[in-house]
Structures are given as C-alpha cells and as structure tokens.
Amino acid sequence: LRYKAEAYCSSMERCVTDVEAKLSQWGATPEVMEKIVRHLQDERYIDQKRFCSAFVRDKYRFNQWGRVKISQALRMKKIPADVIAEGLEEIDEREYVEILSGLIEQKRSRVKACTEYERNGKLIRFAVGRGFEIEAVCRCVIQTGEDDVYLD
C-alpha cells in the first residue's frame, strides 16, 4: 500500500487530504494511513506548501479563479491558513487584474441586459462567482464600462 501511495503522489502534487481519501478508498485503517502519510511527508512525496503553490498557480492561470475561490478550495482540502496566505502571495497583482479585466470584457460582450445598471450587476455576480474580491470587481467593471463609452 505504501508503494501504491508513493506512485499516486509521484504522478502529480497531492495534499494530505487527497492521500488520506485515496488510502481510505483502498481500505487502509487509520493507523496505517497515519504511518503512510508520515512516511510520504518525510520522503517529501507530500509537501503542503508545494501543493498549495501549484494549486494556486494552476487555478489562477488555467481556470481563472480569483483569490477567494482558491482560498476556499484550499480550506476544503484542510490546508493550514498560513500556508494558504503564503501561496496566495505568489499571485502577481498586475496579472491578476489583467485576468479579471479580460474575463469581464469577454462576459460584457455576451451579457444581455436592458440597462447598464443591470449589465454591471450581472458582470459583478459573474466575477464574484469566479472568486474575485468585490472591490476589485467593481473597479474593473467601472473601468471596462468607461472604455466602452469612449469607443462609441
């Protein structure tokens, strides 16, 4: 079971919660699970900080999630708060705002609304649902809205 767990952790970054779930699925007892997880951590197959960094990078770049949604997902995986904070600090602020602006611009062209107020409400709900902070979303919606006014 230990070798199986090592192979499982070698294929991609895993957190303790994922490994425990898989070991449980394989029928390991809590004592065996604890020993295997400790071994995997000692041999650096599992590293919470490394997992957190990879998770943040992937969800932010590829899934275009905001900090709030990423943080929530990491909490669901029982990652310590200090490790989450450290991982979220790796996000480049300029790139973060560019991703948010791009999402809002794409969505703005597809949203059907009678008034600008209604359109902005839909855009804000969309971006907040993606996990971006409300302040950043409102700022971005206003900025992209101003750009549209100048283009007309």
Language-model-detected regions and their locations in the chain:
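An alpha-helical, amphipathic repeat domain used for nucleic-acid recognition
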Residues: 1-152
